[in-house]
Amino acid sequence: MNDTTQPIVRMQQLNKHFGSLHVLNNIDLDIVPGEVVVIIGASGSGKSTLIRCINGLEEFQSGNLVVDSSELLPYGKSTQALQKIRTEVGMVFQQFNLFPHLSVLDNVTLAPMKVRGLSRDDAISSGKRLLDRVGIADQADKYPSHLSGGQQQRVALARALAMEPRLMLFDEPTSALDPEMIGEVLDAMRELAKEGMTMVIVTHEMGFAREVADRVIFIHKGEIAEQGPPEKLFDTPQHERTQSFLARVLKH
């Protein structure tokens, strides 16, 4: 992580409701370029909702949110900012969301051609490099249904990287994978972290969080209960809720 002080993400007093349920409660969060932030917490705590607010997939009701110098407004009233943010922010989901009728390479090259205006030759050249980078260059001509879950998730990662994002969001990227396939996806993410990519990761993989994170955030019932360097949060958590959560998940 570098010491650039201007945050790429700034949340101030952000609130999100689903009906009467207060999902995010006065969230204050700055993320600086090059930082790897891992968000942990129980299911339903608001982790995924938080990162989905960052790229406008979820509207929020009040507060301030600036992403890469573009301000997102409450209730989704930020069409132009949203378009810019979605070209600068990549996201990898639990499900792979690949186009089943397109080859692996075509899945990776489509958005750069349609959105960024790359020529087909340039997009193909870049796409092949990215597939090699995530370790599946030999799968370029196959279709998603012919790949394992781990391979499909690495295609999804290459597709997100093809837009040359300044920030990558990961929403439990290994939760839909068979256990033996989790490692290959985490390895690709480790390489990204080493290269200095700014990353916000929601995960249940605590060993991975300890290894790659610059900062770990524990969310409890829509609030940031505790945050800090991984060695501090995992080894000497201060908040009773953090202690209880870690005692449960680290037993398994």
Spans of model-derived segments:
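Pre-NBD coupling/linker segments of ABC/ABC-like ATPases
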Residues: 2-3, 242
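ABC family nucleotide-binding domain
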Residues: 6-230
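C-terminal boundary and immediately downstream tail of ABC-type ATPase nucleotide-binding domains
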Residues: 220, 227, 231-252
